[in-house]
Amino acid sequence: NLTISFSGTLDAHMNRLEKEDGRKMTNLELSLRTGLSDRYIQDLRKEEKNVSFETVCAICIGLHLHPKFSNDLISKSRNDYPLTEEGYFDQFLIEHHYMETLDLCNDKLREMGYRTWGKEL
């Protein structure tokens, strides 16, 4: 069940998802996929924090969330896609490249001259 909060929803996704090897998704694994610290991810799962749009997108791609779940998480983070060409491209990546790596998405963002998501790995 997904809650109405960002932190509760992120925690629920982390608890239900499995890595490729069938084991539970961990803060450390998501940290390795996004460049965000495992401590920061732990904090995001426990308490409501202001989180940037780019950080939420990095988490969505790192978890390979289906676009419906990504859009829900983005909304709960009190963010939205900017109504710009960059925002439309962000939405395109979330909706069509969610099974890719964050590195690949960031390469596409860089090619377009847009801000990258997460931290550089």
Give the ranges of each region predicted by the language model.
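Short, leucine-enriched amphipathic alpha-helices that occur as contiguous helical runs
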Residues: 3-7, 38, 86
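Short alpha-helical "recognition helix" segments of helix-turn-helix
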Residues: 24-33, 59
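Key DNA-contact positions within bacterial/archaeal DNA-binding proteins
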Residues: 28, 39, 68
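Recognition helix of helix-turn-helix/homeodomain-like DNA-binding domains
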Residues: 31-51, 76-78
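Short, charged recognition helix plus adjacent turn
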Residues: 71-100
